[in-house]
Each structure stands twice: as C-alpha cells, then as structure tokens.
C-alpha cells in the first residue's frame, strides 16, 4: 500500500483520538504539538482541507509560554463545522502552569476563526455554581446528535484542599449540554462562564471496597451509539485489594439538572454530585482486568457492543468485544505481539485499525483477519491513533517524518 503525506510544514500536526473529521468530510482538525505531552506549550489549532491539502489556522492562543495556557486534543462536532479542544486557563504562568485541573473546553466555529467559545463554565471559588465545574475537562467526545459532549475531569478545588476530611481529586466522567451558565469573573482570571451546563455522571469512592463494584477512577469513555448511555473504564479493587480496570455503563436520565444525593456543584470538601436518575452498572468481571495500556473504548453504531483492549492467555494485548446485553466477551485479534496504539472501529463495525509491531494494521472484525497496510521505517515512524475516514475507504494517521529541520508529526492517508 502507498501512503500519501498530506502535511509538510516543520511543526507537529497531532490528531486527537476521535472525531478528527468534519461531518461533511472536508476538514481534519489537529493541534500543532510535536509530542503528546506538550499541550501546555502548544498554541495553535488548525484544519486541513482533505482535497486541496491546504491548512488554515483557526485559533492561536495569545499569550503563550512553556507554562501555558496551552491548547490541543481537538474534535469536530458531529452536526456542524465547529471544533472543540482543551484550552488551559488564561492566567497560566510559572506558578500556575497548565495541568489536569487547569483546563477547560473551548470551541471555534470555522466561519468565525479566532473567536473562542467557552463551553464548560468554571468556578473555583465558593459559593460554587450548579452547571459549572471547578477544574479541568479534557478528551471531549460529541454524541451522535451533537447535543451532548462527554469528557473526563479532574477537580482543582479538591486538588488544593487541605482539610483532612476532603474528598480525593479522582478522575471522573462528565457530560455537558446546551444551557448557558453564568459565573462571576474574578480578578485572578480563574473563572469563566460557559455555553453548556456541565455535570459529573460517574460515581467514585475515595477507597473502593475490595470485591465490590465501587470504583476509584472513571476514565476513557465512549458513547453507546446514539443512546443516552456511556461506557467507561473504572478502577475497582479485587478481593485481594489490588486495583483492576473493568468496564462500566452509565444511563442518563432526561433531565440532568436535577440534584441527586449531593450538590451538582460540589462543596469545598466534596466532589461535584451526580444528577438524580443517573444509573451506573458494572459490565465486565474479568480475571485480571482489561488492558492498562492507555486506550479509549469504542462502540458499534447501535450501542450494543463495546470494543476494548485486553491481554490474552499469553499476555499479548489484543482487541476484544463485550456485549452490553449479557456481558459476553469475545477475542477479535490474535497477533503474536502487542497492539501498541489506541484503536478505532469503523462505523459499520466491520473493521478496526491500530498499530502492531510498528505496522499499521487493518482488522476484519468478522473473520478476525489482519492486514498490514503500512510498515513503519526509519524515515516514517508511526505515532498516535489511526482513524477511519467518514466517507471513503481511507485511513488517516500520524507519523514522524525526518527532514533537514528535524523530525515532525505529519498527517498521512492510505486507502484500504
């Protein structure tokens, strides 16, 4: 197979793990990181026209330094020409650098570049605000309808809390939806209003009871088709008190603004509360947990199957599926060596794509047959997460390309 290089400038062109292509298929969105760890010092979001291969800067964060604010991890809305990405807090400096609890979601409509739209509101001072969070959202994922956005979250207030009875700052999963939230602007520049109402929807415990379905962390979720349901990864404790990752499912009620057991906005010592009517259940009960290799869950179009990575009997990381209805797990890949990238699944659920042995591999899910599309070589080294095109039998992916100016992450495409 022959891959075609689409970008060439001497900077990074990092694709996020999901929803990188506009619904119309015309654009790919990326940030200019040249290393996955560099969001804090990255200041540009750009789009690539897939037909002309021209690029456009749609947002530049000013001012910018090695301490932040930082932008990155951009996704396209499923129903409009709008991108959403991580944006560090504008007052970032050496004392207050970009971090897990110091970021929010900002959108740009392509017809209005350079005009940031703050999506989730932020208020880190008591009294806190229902619908506003107190820390950092990231890894935003749009529902098929475009109405909801899921995210993972860490809490600045709890991170900074010194009270001995304060909840731990544990990663959780949240959802935002259209309903503007006003927050008073503070002199320090920590707070912002938002176009969306944000809530936390996963229930975590400071310390999970061994052998129970309690979780200490919720992360790396996906929407279940077009349903009001999410699947996510959660850390449980085994009867031997060891941490293990399992898959959980959340059902969302019609009204996410109703207060449940505790306040939606949280308190100085407690987490933001889960809305009334949200239910959470454990889906998998595996012997050793699913893979701890960082990856995001994926679903088929009907939301009846979740795809994930887990080690086989020989300890090799393979692709698996689990059925929502009965929890039955099936191994889909049978490689001799580990899958070593996050994966994506085609909307038809007929194929998956990922990296194995530094090769770009396409898996036929029905027959469990893999096909190597591209072999990595010293001049083109695969990195990141490969993606299926929305409209054609094309895969987009990142690779480092060497040049006289250095080695830079570029965007490629390849047919299959």
What are these regions (language model features)?
Residues 1-416:
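Sequence signature of WD/YWTD-type beta-propeller architectures
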């Amino acid at each position: 197979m022959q891959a075609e290089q689409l970008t060439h400038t001497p900077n990074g062109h990092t694709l996020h793990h999901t929803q990188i292509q506009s619904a119309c298929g015309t654009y790919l969105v990326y940030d200019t990181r040249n290393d996955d760890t560099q969001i804090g010092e990255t200041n540009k979001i750009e789009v690539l026209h897939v037909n002309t291969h021209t690029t456009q800067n749609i947002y530049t964060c000013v001012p910018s330094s090695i301490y932040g604010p930082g932008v990155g991890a951009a996704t396209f809305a499923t129903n409009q020409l709008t991108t959403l990405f991580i944006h560090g807090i504008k007052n970032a400096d050496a004392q207050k650098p970009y971090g897990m609890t110091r970021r929010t979601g900002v959108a740009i409509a392509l017809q209005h570049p350079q005009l940031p739209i703050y999506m989730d509101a932020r208020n880190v001072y008591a009294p806190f605000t229902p619908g506003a969070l107190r820390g950092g959202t990231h890894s935003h994922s749009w529902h098929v309808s475009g109405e909801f956005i899921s995210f993972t979250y860490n809490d600045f207030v709890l991170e900074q809390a010194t009270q001995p009875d304060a909840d731990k700052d544990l990663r959780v999963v949240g959802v935002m939806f259209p309903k503007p939230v006003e927050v008073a602007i503070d002199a320090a520049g920590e707070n912002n209003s938002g176009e969306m109402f944000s809530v936390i929807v996963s229930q975590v415990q400071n310390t999970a009871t061994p052998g129970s379905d309690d979780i200490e962390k919720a992360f790396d979720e996906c929407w279940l088709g077009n349903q009001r349901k999410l699947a996510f990864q959660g850390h449980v404790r085994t009867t031997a008190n060891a941490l293990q990752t399992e898959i959980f499912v959340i059902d969302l009620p019609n009204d996410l603004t109703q207060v449940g057991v505790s306040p939606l906005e949280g308190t100085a010592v407690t987490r933001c509360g889960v809305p009334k009517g949200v239910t959470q259940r454990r889906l998998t009960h595996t012997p050793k947990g699913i893979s701890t290799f960082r990856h995001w869950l994926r679903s088929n179009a009907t939301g009846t199957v979740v795809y994930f990575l887990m080690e086989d009997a020989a300890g090799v990381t393979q692709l698996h599926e689990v059925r929502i209805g009965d929890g039955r797990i099936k191994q889909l890949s049978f490689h001799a060596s580990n899958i070593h990238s996050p994966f994506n699944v085609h909307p038809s659920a007929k194929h998956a794509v990922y990296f194995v042995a530094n090769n770009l591999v396409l898996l036929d899910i029905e027959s469990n047959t893999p096909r190597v599309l591209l072999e990595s070589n010293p001049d083109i080294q695969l990195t990141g997460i490969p993606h299926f095109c929305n409209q054609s039998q094309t895969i987009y992916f990142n690779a480092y390309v060497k040049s006289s100016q250095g080695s830079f992450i570029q965007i490629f495409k390849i047919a299959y």
